[in-house]
A protein has these predicted regions:
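A flexible loop/linker signature enriched in serine peptidases of the S9 family
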Residues: 3-10, 19-34, 38-41, 45-52, ...
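Blade-terminus and WD-like Trp-Asp/Gly-His loop motifs, strongest in beta-propeller folds
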Residues: 12-19, 67-74, 108-117, 153-161, ...
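A short helix->beta-strand "capping" segment at the edge of beta-propeller domains
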Residues: 48-64, 325-342
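Long hydrophobic segments that form regular secondary structure
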Residues: 70-77, 82, 86-87, 331-390, ...
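Disordered, low-complexity segments in secreted/periplasmic proteins that are enriched in proline
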Residues: 302-321, 366-374, 399-412, 450-470
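Extended, small/polar residue-biased N-terminal targeting/export presequences
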Residues: 536-590, 650-678, 861-862, 866-878
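PDZ/PDZ-like domain segments forming the peptide/carboxylate-binding groove
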Residues: 572-624, 699-700, 821-822
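Cleft-lining beta-strand/loop regions that shape enzyme active-site pockets
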Residues: 594, 598-600, 615-811, 848-856, ...
């Protein structure tokens, strides 16, 4: 009924007499005369004063988005709230680097080894570029001019070159003296990953993906030349996060065994990660041989370690010497040695400034037991030669609390991002939550001298070929927790300028990260020009997010949006549930309705059953005229006290005290009831011959549940796989890999019946159910099911929301979703805005719902029964 050719139409509202519709169009109000079809803009002029002062002073305390240490370790450069500061690491004295006159975001600072320069990322020019300045922030110089994202800012140890990666899949070097930029290497697939420079500044190690999306570590001359893969594809599945040890003898990196998509793993088997050390030179002895075969040798090694612990001037001079890194390429890959037991997910790596130790972050990934799998997670220092592992004192428990507004940028992958050793090797600095912490290290934790003692074996002082790599006893740590590096600074905040910064930052991030460079046909520059003038009249962040959402809406894409920010919503009142439904009765009291299986009230020791009357709750008489929900808002851990009777009266009633369920737990109970009801429909309609399972989400827990449900249905003749109301995730390939299995044999043992060899597969007819609420990966799954010819799909077209998405934290702490990869079928169909069509179309209408029927499930059973009727039983089924 409207004919506008531009803008967006929002919030139509019809008058009570049905004659007029008022709506919002192109930032104005319009009126539609229903009878004539004519539209007219409603002119409104509102004069108002600003309700808040747009300029304010905020006190920022201890926030750190990113940091790096000065060469002396006495100061650190930090980024916070888009500004750069240097701070004394011992007393919190803080100095702001020269401030910009306009709102901008400066982040990811890196201090050169000679102390003369600080490099950082800044969007002060209108796009993310790399700048360098002196430590006071004077004479800033922009060294890049590329209209794309950059990352992995890394200084060479001699401070002559600055390396960085860019979204054009290249690794660049910038010469500080001559200002020349050169290409070091490039990738054919994606951006260069982690980057690390050798101690002599002659070599660079980096990771990049191959065509199968496996990450590999390479070494190349920093001046340019042949790059070499450091490992063997037959030995290691993937490598990344390479760092050089300070003595130049080892390249240390992480390696994974098996494939993981970040949500679940191939076949549901957990992917493991381990730390590996690659000896760069030929070795004339077994590195695992400690020559500690008796007590005397063990005591001598410990004495040598204690003597070296003081280090003194000679030790300092040795540490300052620059090693000449020599690489013996022959047999390089076979000199790789696993340092830690697989199972731990290893995060950042940082080399110690001397010797052959590295610091790392680790989280428990379910290792296969024993050894140094950093059980429980944390931060550790690992001597890659001796295998000694020492736990670093953690940040206090409150360290994870913070504003949550930092570090959302292009995630530099330089060595040791987030962990830095002090030059004296006595302190390790790291970020935790929103703060910066300093952890004291035990003597000989990470020096070459520390390795002289050998790895202390489990039963004594070690032995030949048995490096310990055990996590050190916590009592050896010099402090229970790390010390926070504290500071306080007052910042003047121009909220109008901040909103403009966030708007443009969000626009630029979508420009650089949206999976379709053509922006789904939208003129992205023109879109910004349409909405940017509105910034002048915005009054708060909610209005900012509204126009940003409208701007993003021009992309006509899913998995997008802006949320959160500096003014988080207050926590919602927690409603809790007793585990049964209340049904109004003519007596004026409520009756107990359905009791949820495995819920709070589903226990033999509770004297309560459907049909009982609830006379009161917590001494409040409960009548059908009362809103019982107000009594369901209680604190966690408290109990409901119900007065229950088998008749509508207090006389003879008894007390039932129930610990209620929180909202998410009750949602699980409701979901389980819904699944049971669908399963009952299938069982009754097929006389028990057809099985049923539902996939709630496309995540690891749902994959495990799917495998359990599949095993429970393995004796059924056919199977309904329901994935309606599934919001997606990333396990479609795992599911299809299981379902695509075909039976080619069976076994019969003596005095035993027919046995199927693989309970994790299903070999009978199958259908997949979908609806308009099946989204993202829950669309890729039925599309793959159809393409592989595994069976028919029943229901209605899916949502049409299939993009691989990420997220970016904007300067004000809000988050913008960034769809970075599209999905196409093998027939070149882009699945975004597509909607997978079913083979058999059937919808559930409101009338069916009111009658308690699920027509889609009934149709799925009908399809399978027809399939079964047309099949001949196999020998195994006869």
């Amino acid at each position: 009924v409207t004919r506008h050719v531009d803008g967006n139409l929002f919030w139509p509202s019809m008058s009570s007499d049905g004659k007029v519709i008022v709506y919002e169009e192109l930032f104005g109000l319009w009126k539609l005369d229903v009878a004539t079809g004519k539209t007219n803009e409603i002119k409104i002029e509102i004069s108002a004063d600003e309700k808040d002062n747009e300029t304010d002073v905020e006190t920022v305390t201890n926030e750190v988005d990113a940091f790096d240490l000065s060469p002396s370790g006495r100061r650190a450069v930090i980024s916070a709230r888009g500004q750069l500061f240097t701070i004394a690491t011992d007393r919190g004295d803080i100095t702001r680097l020269a401030a910009d006159n306009q709102a901008s975001r400066n982040q990811f600072p890196k201090w050169s080894a000679d102390g003369k320069y600080i490099a950082y990322m800044s969007d002060k020019s209108g796009r993310d570029e790399i700048w360098i300045s002196d430590p006071e922030g004077r004479s800033p110089k922009k060294i890049t001019d590329l209209d794309n994202e950059k990352g992995a800012i890394v200084w060479t140890p001699d401070s002559k070159l600055l390396l960085y990666t860019a979204a054009d899949k290249k690794l660049y070097s910038y010469g500080v003296a001559d200002g020349k930029t050169m290409t070091v290497t490039s990738s054919d697939v994606n951006r260069i990953g982690s980057v690390a420079v050798s101690p002599d500044s002659k070599w660079v190690a980096f990771s990049k993906l191959d065509r199968t999306l496996r990450s590999h570590v390479y070494i190349a001359p920093i001046a340019g030349g042949e790059e070499r893969h450091v490992s063997d594809d037959r030995l290691l599945y993937a490598e990344s996060n390479a760092v050089w040890t300070a003595d130049g003898r080892y390249l240390v990196f992480t390696s994974t065994e098996g494939f993981s998509n970040g949500i679940a793993t191939q076949g549901g088997i957990g992917t493991t990660m381990a730390l590996w050390a690659l000896a760069l030179q030929d070795q004339d002895r077994d590195p695992m041989n400690r020559d500690i075969d008796n007590e005397a040798q063990g005591l001598a090694a410990e004495a040598a370690a204690r003597q070296a612990g003081g280090r003194g001037q000679a030790g300092a001079a040795a540490a300052a010497a620059v090693p000449d890194v020599r690489i013996d390429w022959g047999g390089l890959a076979r000199r790789a040695r696993q340092v830690t037991v697989p199972g731990t997910t290893i995060g950042a790596l940082a080399p110690a400034p001397e010797g052959h130790a590295v610091a790392l972050t680790a989280s428990n990934g379910g290792g296969r037991g024993g050894g140094n799998d950093a059980a429980g997670g944390g931060m550790f220092v690992v001597d890659v030669e001796s295998g000694q592992v020492t736990r670093v004192p953690p940040a206090p428990a409150a360290a994870n609390e913070g504003r949550g507004g930092g570090g959302g940028g292009p995630a530099p992958a330089g060595a040791g991002a987030g962990i830095v050793f002090a030059r004296d090797v006595r302190t390790l600095y790291f970020r935790s939550g929103a703060g910066l912490y300093a952890a004291p290290l035990a003597p000989n934790t990470n020096t070459a001298a520390g390795a002289a003692a050998g790895g202390a074996g489990r039963g004594g002082r070690g032995g030949r070929g048995a490096a310990s790599a055990e996590v050190a006893d916590a009592s050896a740590a010099p402090a229970a927790t790390a010390r926070q590096v504290t500071y306080t600074v007052n910042l003047e905040v121009d909220r109008k300028a901040l909103r403009a910064q966030v708007f443009n930052e969000g626009w630029r991030i979508m420009k650089n990260r949206f999976y379709d460079a053509k922006m789904h046909g939208a003129n992205w520059n023109a879109v910004r020009e349409m909405y940017e003038p509105l910034l002048e009249n915005l009054v708060d962040e909610d209005e900012l997010h509204t126009i940003m959402m409208m701007m993003i809406g021009h992309l006509n894409a899913s998995h997008t949006g802006v949320s959160g920010g500096p003014n988080p919503m207050q926590a919602a009142v927690q409603t809790r549930y007793p585990g049964f439904d209340l049904v109004a009765d003519a007596s004026g009291y409520y009756k107990v309705g359905h009791i949820y299986k495995n819920g709070p009230a589903d226990h033999d020791y509770f004297k309560i059953k459907p049909g009982d009357f609830i006379v009161s709750i917590d001494d409040h008489e409960l009548k059908t005229s009362d809103n019982y929900w107000r009594y369901f808002t209680i604190a966690a851990g408290n109990k409901f006290h119900f007065l229950v009777n088998d008749r509508p009266a207090r006389d003879g009633a008894w007390d039932v005290a129930i610990t209620p369920a929180a909202g998410p737990a009750f949602a699980d109970l409701q979901y389980a009831r819904w699944v049971d009801e669908r399963r009952d429909i299938v069982t009754k309609a097929s006389n028990g011959e057809i099985g049923y399972l539902h996939i709630r989400a496309m995540d690891a827990p749902s994959l495990r549940q799917f495998q359990l449900d599949l095993a429970a249905n393995r004796t059924k003749k056919a199977l309904v796989i329901d994935q309606r109301f599934n919001g997606g995730g990333g396990i479609d390939q795992e599911l299809l890999g299981i379902l695509a299995g075909r039976q080619y044999q069976y076994t019969i043992g003596r005095d035993a019946g027919f046995q199927q060899p693989r309970p994790q597969n299903f070999y009978g007819p199958m259908v997949v159910m979908q609806n308009e609420r099946s989204a993202s990966d829950a669309e890729m799954f039925p599309a793959g099911f159809k393409a592989l010819g595994l069976g028919k799909v029943v229901g209605v077209p899916t949502m049409g929301a299939v993009i691989g998405t990420g997220a970016y934290t904007l300067l004000d702490g809000s988050t913008i979703r960034t769809p970075a990869s599209g999905v196409w079928t093998t027939t070149s169909q882009n699945m975004e805005n597509y909607g997978v069509p079913p083979d058999v179309f059937i919808d559930n209408l409101p009338g069916d719902f009111l009658k308690g029927r699920d027509m889609q499930v009934e149709k799925a059973v009908e399809v399978l029964k027809a399939d079964l009727a047309g099949r001949k039983p196999t020998t195994a089924q006869q």
